[in-house]
Amino acid sequence: MTVEVHVVTEPTDEIIAAFGRLLPQLSRSAPPLDREALDRMLRHDANTVFVARMDGEIVGTLTLVMVPIPSGLRARIEDVVVDAGARGSGVGSALTLAAMRVAESANARTLDLTSRPERDSAGRLYERLGFRERDSRVYRLES
């Protein structure tokens, strides 16, 4: 099956439903996105939101965040989720490659992402695509 990746620009009912189905597969604690929250996310200048389709159905999503800082334009891949039934069929790769192309065309100096250690297949995918593990600590302040 062919995977098609598109940039999302409008919070349609289909997109809202897809996020409602996909987001819980990424995080049990993530609140559901309503139309207003999705619209705010899509309209933010730093974000490029991608969806992947197989046979017309949305089976994955990825958000690329690009921010200019004093050391240059930096990019991050966030909230990658592929529907459980579509994993292993190239969806994650197609989404990541699309984000890589956009970051490269914007002349981002770096493209970072994080992945949980237990997600071995995701780690292997990112390494196949050229990402390398950094010797870095990640800190988080919960609100």
PLM regions: where:
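Conserved GNAT-fold acetyl-CoA-binding loop/helix
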Residues: 10-40
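A short helix-loop-beta-strand connector motif used in the catalytic cores of GNAT acetyltransferases and
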Residues: 40-51, 76
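Conserved beta-strand in the GNAT
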Residues: 51, 57-66, 76, 81
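Conserved acetyl-CoA-binding loop-helix of GNAT-fold acetyltransferases
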Residues: 82, 88-101, 124-128
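Conserved active-site alpha-helix within GNAT-family acetyltransferase domains
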Residues: 93, 109, 117-135, 140-141
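Conserved GNAT acetyl-CoA-binding A-motif
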Residues: 96, 103-115
